[in-house]
Amino acid sequence: MNSQIKNKAVYWGTGRRKTSVARVRLIPGNGLIKINGRSGDDYLNFNPLHLNSIKAPLQTLGLENSYDILVNVFGGGLTGQADAIKQGAARALCELSPDNRKPLKTEGHLSRDPRAKERRKYGLKKARKAPQFSKR
């Protein structure tokens, strides 16, 4: 699968989700995750859903214990940040080898999730919630 691996030490990728932006670096290592200088478990409050989301692109390619993930992330909440990190890691893996693109794309790790908070409209209480209607 990895026939054209480049001899580079660091692979970069940027991911976005909602208002979160993650700059992800992949370094050959043993599967360590560091987010904003803290361990991945600590930063994500030991939430297995978020941790599995981050590891998903590496697991798709069978490389979960081959690379360390170093991340700078800002904006949004934990779910948005975890998905931004996932997309950034997938993009970094594409930089590692062009052969990685197809399996990552079929799993949906490279596509940006367009869902975001809908804006509030005037005359309404929230984005779609209208004030109580009174017939008389």
Curated annotation (Swiss-Prot):
Region (Disordered): 97-136
Entry keyword set: Ribonucleoprotein, Ribosomal protein
One cellular component term from this protein's GO annotations in UniProt: cytosolic small ribosomal subunit
One GO-annotated biological process of the protein: translation
Pfam family, one: Ribosomal_S9
MF terms in GO: RNA binding; structural constituent of ribosome
Compositionally biased region (Basic and acidic residues): 98-116
Record's keyword annotation contains Cell inner membrane: no
Compositionally skewed regions (Basic residues) per UniProt: 117-136
Recorded family membership: Belongs to the universal ribosomal protein uS9 family.
Protein name: Small ribosomal subunit protein uS9
Lineage start: Bacteria, Bacillati, Cyanobacteriota, Cyanophyceae, Synechococcales
